[in-house]
Structure formats: structure tokens, C-alpha cells
Amino acid sequence: MLYYRNLALLSLLSLSSAAPSQVERSPDAVFKPRAVCTPTAGGSSSIDDVPAIRKAISSCGNGGTIVFPAGSTYYLNSVLDLAGCSNCDIQVEGLLMFSGSTEYWGGKTAMININKINALKLRSLTGSGVIDGNGQNAYDLFASNSDYERPTLLYITGGSNIEVSGLRQRNPPNVFNSVKGDAKDVTFTNLRMDATSRSDNPPKNTDGFDIGSSTHVTISSVSVSNDDDCVALKPGCNYVTVENVTCTGSHGISVGSLGKSSADTVQNVYAHRITMIDSTKAAGIKTYPSGNGHGLSTVKNVTFSDFNVRGCDYAFQIQSCYGESASYCASHPGNAILQDIIVKGFSGTTSGKDDWVVADLNCGARGTCDVSMSDFSVKAPSGKATVLCANTPSSLGVTCTSGASG
């Protein structure tokens, strides 16, 4: 019996040793809270708060949280570089007000620079946070000097896992948001964006989003009021989703322009549930023709779906002679490759600027025009609808009238 009792005891010990043992960890290692920093505002537009913000990033940028409280105003008189902010959470609940100095900002690339940063959140949890580019002086100067170089409000180059959400962006001197440099997994959501001039000089070139060389960019639940492209899909962008977006006064959701001086590609774009108000077009593709140093443009797998058109000049437009005259393109036809382009679910009414014309599809005579249209019910104010076409396939899906241009 003693033998069997010892054997049972050994079996229990063996089972106990085989089971995973609990590892002791210090509470700090498991539940260590994020460091939280609140920059000290100078309280005057004559005091640049960027150094104080940089100090907060130095202290809390690595895995911490930086808070700009509701009701606070921070004056930014120089470029805000977010370098050092890795896996950090920047919460803007107050106002970030940039200076209107055309002297300082002339020639600058960015007002907020996000360069090769991974895991960054720039957001407002309450929806009260505002980033103001204070662009009025730039609008006025650019009206008299088109060579004046203006900065982008938020400039993302490279990096990954970047979220911009819940904010109001207003009055950038130039583009609101730019993404390039092979950035990956960038999300813009729940943004209110408006560029408004207080003078007769419009806020020129205030694209809502310029999406360049990047992969997996999402733009959702955004409203944009501006004076240029709502979303510009630039060379090198791949896998872009644009959804639940309302644009007013813009140039629409635009692929391009492509092929100005090099071979350019845009591919895998899905834009759906878009409301386009008082814009030059709801959606379109812009490519340069052949010759004169222009490169080959390739646009693949792009879907424009469920667009509500309200007072736009065109619902859909293809320009294969962008940047050149009609006489030039007669001898140097467009050669862009448009492959698997789907336009479906468009409804609403155009502005009537071009009488009954609701779409203008000028595909290149030497290119590929793999475009299909379905459930397209946009009409002119008169109730009639004409789609102008050139070099489009017989399988297009709508009745064409010759005479397309652009």
C-alpha cells in the first residue's frame, strides 16, 4: 500500500510540475498608466507655444498622452513637428491657432509635420478640438502673387497606424491633409473641414485630402467645404476607401492629375456614399496626354458608388487632355490606361452650367477605356440628361452623344 500511495503522490507532483506556473509580475509592469502631459500655453499670440508642445512630446511622446484642454488656446508661430511621438495620443480639445505670417510660412512644406511616425493618434474625444491654419493672409497674397508657396496644414510622410479623428480643421493656407512617402494604414474620420475667405480672394488650392504614395488609407464620415479637390487621389496611392463624405464647393473626388512628367499609377480605390454639393464635378479622372515629356497614366480598379449630386456642373468626367490644348491633343492623343473603372448609383441634379450635359467622358484615342456605368439617373435642371463621350466602349452602359472634350 505504501508503494501505491507514493506512486499516487509522485503522479500528483508530476501533474503539478507540468502545469504552467503563475509568473509574478510587479503591478507597475502590468498596469503602468500612460504618462499624461498638458503643455503650458503662453496666453498671447506673440508667444510661440510650439516649444512648450515639443517639451511635452519629449516627456510624454513615447507611449503617453498629450492633452490640449477644452477652452484653451495655443498659438503656433512655427512648424509643429511631432517627431518623438511614437504610440502616443494627442488629444486636442481646445484651439491650435497658427500664425498668419506670410513671411514665415512662405516656402514651408507643412504646418504640422508627421514624418515616419508609427502608432499616432491626433484627435478630439469631445469634438470641440480645432486646428486653425489662419490662411486669410495667404489667400490674399496668392491672389496677387501666384508664385507664393504655401504650406499644407497636416503633412504625413511615411509611418503607419496613424489616426486623425474628431477634429475641426479650418482655413489652411493650402491643402488640408497630405499623405505620401509610402505611409501605411492611415485613417481620417469624423472631421469637419472648411476653408472660408473673408475677402473677395478665394481660398485657392485648399484640397481636403491629397493622397499620394501610400497603402490602405481610409477617409470616412467627413464634411469638406473648400475651393479645390475634395479628395485628390495622387500618383502611387493604393487601396484607398472614401465613404460617407459630404463635399461642398469642391472639384469632387478626383483621380489625378496623372502623367505630367512621369509614369503614374492609381489603383484599388473605393469611393461610396458621397454627397457632392455645388462642385465642378462629383467624380472624375484627369490624365495628361502623350508627348511633351508626359508619362503613361494607369488607373486600375476604381469604383465610384452611390453619389448624390446636388448642383454640380458634371456628375462624372474623364479628361484625357489635361494640361494641354485641344489642338495639341489632336496630334498627341491621350494614351492613359483606364482599367476596371466602375461608376454606379449616381442620382441627383446638375447645375445646368453645360445645359443638358451631366457627364463628359473623353477617353484617350490611343489609350484603354475600360469603364462601365450603371444605375446612373442624374439629370439637368430641365429634367433632361446628355452624356458626352469619346473613345468609350460600346458596353459603357449609358447612351452616349459625341462631343466629349477635356
From Swiss-Prot:
Active-site residues, Swiss-Prot/TrEMBL: D228, H251
Molecular-function GO terms, alphabetical: polygalacturonase activity
Stored InterPro entries: Glyco_hydro_28, PbH1, Pectin_lyas_fold, Pectin_lyase_fold/virulence
Protein name according to UniProt: Probable endo-xylogalacturonan hydrolase A
E.C. number(s) listed in UniProt: 3.2.1.-
Domain of life assignment: Eukaryota
EC category: hydrolase
Signal peptide annotation: 1-18
Entries under Gene3D superfamilies matching the protein: Single-stranded right-handed beta-helix, Pectin lyase-like
PbH1 repeats: 183-213, 214-235, 237-257, 299-320
Known role: Pectinolytic enzyme involved in the degradation of xylogalacturonan (xga), a galacturonan backbone heavily substituted with xylose, and which is one important component of the hairy regions of pectin. Activity requires a galacturonic acid backbone substituted with xylose.
Compartments it resides in: Secreted
Family membership noted in the UniProt record: Belongs to the glycosyl hydrolase 28 family.
Main location: secreted
Glycosylated residue positions: N244, N301
Originating organism: Neosartorya fischeri (strain ATCC 1020 / DSM 3700 / CBS 544.65 / FGSC A1164 / JCM 1740 / NRRL 181 / WB 181)
PANTHER family in UniProt: ENDO-XYLOGALACTURONAN HYDROLASE A-RELATED, PTHR31736
GO biological process: cell wall organization; pectin catabolic process
One GO cellular component term noted in the UniProt record for this chain: extracellular region
Keywords: Carbohydrate metabolism, Cell wall biogenesis/degradation, Glycoprotein, Glycosidase, Hydrolase, Polysaccharide degradation, Repeat, Secreted, Signal
SMART domains: PbH1
